[in-house]
Amino acid sequence: LDDTAMTYTAFFTHGTDLDSRWLITCDHATNFIPPFVNGGDLGLPAEDMERHIAYDPGAYGVARALGEALSAPVVASNFSRLVIDPNRGEDDPTLLMELYDGTIIPANRHADEAELNMRLNRCHRPYHDTVAELAARREDTIIVAIHSFTPQLRGRPPRPWEIGILYPDGERLSPALIDMLAAPGALTVGDNEPYTGYLPGDAIDRHGTA
């Protein structure tokens, strides 16, 4: 193994010494492929690795800025969602994608159980262990998960929202935030759009609503 593989960590953290009820997470922060995953290459051209299928463009920068604004800790993944998706439960069939938005992921097509478990142990589980550790430091922790979404999936209608606030049923902060952001002349806000804020086993379900 090269030095990168030996020193690799599955997450970035910032401000972990801050005592804040806020915790900022970024599940899809990077398009990085660790060298122990198919030699650091999933078989996709560079232009596909820059698409939303590989990560959430811009999300990490927003997470860092929000962490600074709130004086809150930030934890972000250090692996592409195509390696293994940290925003999926371990039993979710989309945990390791073979086809995403019309693009075949060559290195994932024949990944066996041993490969899946290796990616879980090297990437997915260490990231979630860190989120869980930071979330458990206070009883009143509020997790804000930062994502970005593509304006249009292939073969689908355009998404008109400039920002989406996603949340599970019964959550109280998000509706007030939506009202503020959607004030006249402000933003086009998706209320649990472009997708629902509750997916069983996802990162928020695991750490924020358990």
What are the language-model segments listed below?
Residues D2-I143, S148-A210:
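N-terminal catalytic or cofactor-binding beta/alpha core of small enzyme domains
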